[in-house]
Amino acid sequence: MNWKDRTELLLGKERNDAICSATVLVAGVGGVGGYAVEMLARAGVGNLIIIDDDVVKESNINRQIIATAKNVGTSKVELMKERILDINPQANVLAIKSFIDEDNVGEFIRRFKPNFVIDAIDSISPKIALIKYCIESNVKIISSMGAGGRMDPTKIQYADISKTTNCALARTVRERLKKQGITKGLPTVFSTEPV
């Protein structure tokens, strides 16, 4: 049995083929983004673009899938690329060591034409730039809000940005997007657990 056969049994051939040929861009491969990329690789997503300018720090070891004592100081995207290819050697993986900002976000989206974008950025301005560009360009995106300090997995929710509660990052994102004329249309994952 091929390792992708179980996904095909679950989703059917047509959906499995779509996953295998999909292009997903993940911005931020630390805590949330690292686990998202791992699951995309295990699902068989054929084309992954991973963007992050950070290196592994000792403080990442307790929560980031790629962080170990051995690789402190190493580029997160290079480590993640290696991990993806260990899972699926046939995957096309482009690791870009860069921050996303207003000046380069359009270039990344136009150049790679992702079917889907996962925003796992933890800095406000780059997060807003990516979200705004994707919404205005009709590129499917989901955005991760604040997870730090939360411990109750039953409080994790999926909702439009306009419906988020109890999350300081979501509130800030909502306010900044509103100034840009965006009040809804952004799927998010957030926690209702008070910090």
Where are the model-predicted features located?
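E1/E1-like adenylate-forming module used to activate ubiquitin-like modifiers
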Residues: F116, A120-V195
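Short amphipathic alpha-helix with an adjacent loop that forms part of the alpha/beta core around
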Residues: D103-P114
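Conserved acidic residues
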Residues: S98-F99
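Glycine-rich phosphate-binding loop and adjoining beta1-alpha1-beta2 segment
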Residues: N47-N88
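Hydrophobic/small residue at the entry helix of a nucleotide-binding pocket
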Residues: V32-G33
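N-terminal charged helix/coil linker that caps or initiates catalytic domains
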Residues: M1-L25
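Conserved N-terminal Rossmann-fold NAD(P)-binding element of oxidoreductases
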Residues: V26-G28, I51
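Hydrophobic/aromatic anchor residues within beta-strands of the central parallel beta-sheet
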Residues: V93-A95
